[in-house]
Structure formats: C-alpha cells, structure tokens
Amino acid sequence: MSKNAGVVRELMRAFPDDVVAAQDDAEARAAAAELLIEVSVPEFVTAMVAPDGWSSERNGVEGFFSSWGEFVAGFARFAIELEELIERGDVVVVLARQHGVPKGGSAEITTDGAAIFYFRDSLVERLEFHLDRAQALRVIDLEA
C-alpha cells in the first residue's frame, strides 16, 4: 500500500460511525481537524459533487466541516461504509456505500458513492465526494 493510500485509510478510520451525531461532538471534531491539518495542504479543497454536475467547493478544515454539515443537514442519521480503495498515481479513490435516514423518516436510503483524494507531495490537496460512483470513476478514467 502506498503512503497516499495509508493516509486515506487513516482518514476513513477517523470518519464517525454517524456523521450527523458527530456534528455536535467537539472532541471528535477537534481530533478530525488535527488529523486533517496533519495530512493536508493548508487550504485543501473539499468538493461535494452531485450526479447532475452541481458541486460546492470549500477550502481548509472549516470548509470540510461546513460542507459535510450542509450535506447531512436533512438526515437523522448518516454513515459511510468503505468498500474498496483504488490507487492511481497521486490519486486515491474510495468506493463507499452511504446509508442515511432522512429527518422525519424511518426508512434507510442506501447509495453507492465515491470519494476522490488528490495528493501533492503526499498531502491531500483536494477531496471530491461524489454521490454518483460511476461519475467519479469516469473522472479518473475508470469504468464503473
């Protein structure tokens, strides 16, 4: 496993079991911020990418947290399950299954998504979270 893949695995291990519940956990947030600062360039980009091409980009640790906060705002519970890591030079792709229960609902919604981590000098410079796995794989020239 490359150093970059090791960084991604470490970040994924640090991801909370329930992203919604972790929004108000100051200790978990501080630990995640410390790890992000350690493994990323100072103004790394977090991009949330929808299937229709819409995206939102924010910079730095606070941008990461605000992006995720907005994304999970409509959920009572939200979790990410790591399925596979794909390495491609300075890019690492995480294939993941997302599980969420909308606020006011009881049925779980499950989708297959992906995250693309772009590295420079073994530091994360860009993170893209894709709701559409096939679209993410096309971005890096892989077939779904």
What are these regions (language model features)?
Residues 1-34, 38-42, 138-144:
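Short, low-complexity N-terminal intrinsically disordered segments enriched in polar/charged residues
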Residues 1-3, 7, 69-144:
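A beta-strand edge to alpha-helix "cap/lid" segment located at domain peripheries
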Residues 13, 42, 62, 115-117, ...:
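Short non-domain terminal segments
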Residues 20-21, 49, 53, 102:
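Residue-level detector of alpha-helix boundaries and kinks
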Residues 24-25, 60, 132:
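Intrinsic-disorder/low-complexity, polar/charged segments
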Residues 30-90:
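A solvent-exposed, acidic/Ser-Thr-rich amphipathic alpha-helical stretch
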